[in-house]
């Protein structure tokens, strides 16, 4: 079943084109809530940090986000999200997690930000 929306926000044609062009082993996060709504973040390294710290790979600048909040880690071509001891927790599909392997369409909540996870298999050409 192709995914056509991110819950709060329908996917644009540009979003769908970007998802279709993803290389195997990479993924895309699309922000659906927060000051960066509509922003896209490419996951293309083995480890990607998320937090309020300016040195984070993905900077989410809000007091609800810890300086070092979470890490996206790739193992055998699949990404997991790992909470980095954050104060407010990391959630996948509204469940608080310490670590969780991600699937297409999963919604990751970090502070007040919501990010939806996609790989190239989310879209059927």
Predicted regions and their residues:
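Intrinsically disordered, low-complexity acidic Ser/Thr-rich regulatory segments
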Residues: 1-60, 122-125
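Forkhead-associated
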Residues: 37-114, 119
């Amino acid at each position: 079943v192709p995914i056509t929306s991110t819950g709060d926000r329908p996917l644009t044609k540009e979003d769908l084109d970007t998802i279709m062009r993803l290389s195997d082993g990479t993924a895309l996060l699309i922000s659906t809530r927060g000051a960066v709504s509509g922003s896209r973040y490419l996951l293309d390294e083995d480890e990607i940090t998320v937090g309020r710290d300016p040195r984070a790979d993905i900077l989410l600048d809000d007091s609800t986000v810890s300086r070092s909040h979470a890490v996206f880690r790739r193992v055998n071509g699949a990404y997991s999200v790992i909470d980095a001891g954050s104060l407010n927790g990391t959630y996948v599909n509204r469940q608080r997690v310490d670590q969780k392997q991600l699937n297409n369409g999963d919604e990751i909540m970090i502070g007040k930000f919501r990010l939806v996870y996609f790989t190239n298999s989310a879209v059927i050409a």
